[in-house]
Design a protein with these regions (language model features):
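Functionally critical loop-and-helix segments that line ligand-binding/catalytic clefts
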Residues: 57-94, 99, 229-287
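N-terminal Lys/Arg-rich, disordered targeting/topogenic segments
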Residues: 1-25
Length: 287
């Protein structure tokens, strides 16, 4: 094949374009490398800090203790998920004076808690007595906030959705609304329960423009909800000795213990893992 010939001007232009593309590609590769190194650096720093504290600088809460089995289970979960993001749950079961919002951490004070989820409403009319104060404290201390509605399976989904919307004013940077479903209805069929849950979700989604997060226990999800809410963010509670909350399902959050001991809180709390980095968690929040 005869080689195509170019004028000097055209050849020079082609050469310049190739150089531009070459240097552009180098810049892209360099940027990717820098981001990867930063991510690796953060992970290594977290790992080194965690293991150093675990062996040489153990934190012991003055009031709270777990059984050896539970302590080892929690320690293993933390060790296996140092690249993920941690948070906690609170409600009226925690007293206001029990929480020192300035310094909240786990893992021998090496893992900061980045988000907090709090119960806002329950059923048709109830609201958590500490919600408003906890909500403001979380914002004041730059924690990512989440509010959940405890769904009462035999009550009206429209009234329950309105109860949540009247009591919760989500803002930019907050997690999407969270629906907590744990109970089986006594006066409704399971089919009717699913229909009602979808009504609640539809009303709340139309208000905020985001699909609610579905929170439930692993076995409840497997037995009643699986296949019905596949396109919703999933928050599973599983307190067993397992590597993930579900062997079969993708999950976004895992509530892995109800016996969490936190530096800065004088009662045990539920602890949660977000299945990703803090950056990706912020992408999940409301605009």
């Amino acid at each position: 094949m005869t080689q195509k010939k170019y004028s000097k001007k055209t050849a020079k232009k082609i050469h310049q374009n190739r150089r531009k593309h070459y240097f552009f590609r180098r810049k892209i590769l360099l940027a990717i490398l820098i981001i990867a190194l930063i991510g690796t650096g953060f992970y290594l720093k977290q790992s080194v800090s965690y293991y150093y504290a675990m062996y040489f600088n153990k934190f012991k809460h003055k009031k709270l203790h777990n059984t050896e089995i539970e302590a080892l289970r929690i320690q293993k979960i933390l060790s296996d998920n140092l690249d993920k993001t941690y948070g906690f749950d609170i409600s009226h079961y925690q007293n206001r004076e029990d929480i020192s919002w300035d310094s909240l951490s786990i893992g021998n004070k090496t893992i900061p808690l980045e988000f907090v989820v709090m119960r806002a409403t329950m059923g048709n009319r109830s609201a958590d007595k500490h919600f408003d104060e906890f909500w403001e404290q979380a914002k004041k201390h730059n924690l990512i906030r989440g509010a959940y509605h405890f769904y009462r399976a035999d009550e009206d989904p429209v009234v329950q959705a309105n109860n949540f919307l009247e009591n919760v004013k989500l803002e930019s940077g907050d997690l999407p609304p969270i629906l907590d479903i744990e109970k089986i209805p006594k006066r409704k069929t399971n089919k009717k329960l699913i229909e009602d849950l979808k009504v609640w979700c539809k009303i709340v989604e139309e208000t905020y423009g985001e699909k609610p997060i579905i929170y439930t226990y692993y076995h409840y999800y497997k037995d009643f909800l699986k296949g019905e809410f596949d396109d919703y963010p999933l928050w599973l509670a599983n307190y067993n000795d397992v590597p993930t909350p579900s062997p079969d399902d993708n999950w976004d959050f895992w509530q892995f213990t109800e016996n969490g001991i936190v530096h800065g809180i004088n009662t045990k709390v539920d602890l949660d893992i977000y299945n990703g980095s803090l950056w990706s968690l912020k992408r999940l929040t409301l605009d």
